[in-house]
Amino acid sequence: PTGIPDFWLCALRNHEALAQYIEERDEPALSHLQDITVEPLTKDDVKDEENDDEEENDEDPKGFKLLFHFEQPNPFFENAVLTKTYHMVDDEDPILEFSEGTEIDWLAGKNLCVKVMRRKASAKGGKKPNKPATKTERTDSFFNFFSPPEIPDEDAELDENELEQLRDAMEMDYEIGS
């Protein structure tokens, strides 16, 4: 590869909104980031679930995609490009309707979004030696950016605190992407 080594890692580390989400363990994976590009949404990007009829929607979709291009192969995941898509309601005064991210195809044992907790399993009857048991737990990582906040169904009832947390998460998600 040509260019400045770890350019994108350095740029992301110096971005006010993003820097707080980059953990030390993310840095080796982000060192494989080669480019970040942005594209407007096209009709092919949008699956109109509300209009199941045969009518064509002539209106251009509102929103954009951020594409994170990674060196391949890399020792963390199989994806060459990780995408975050922002669907907007209005071009004039853009309002985030929802966002979606690429599912990352992590290589075995390399998922930076979880940590493996090891604990000693108890022996039954003292006959077998203890086997270490493991469980995974979500952890902070830049790569959680590709798993945006989920908007519950209209039927779901959220209390005021849950609604506020969802609103804050969506605002932060959009701030990072824009």
Where are these regions (language model features)?
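Mixed-charge, low-complexity intrinsically disordered segments
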Residues: 2-178
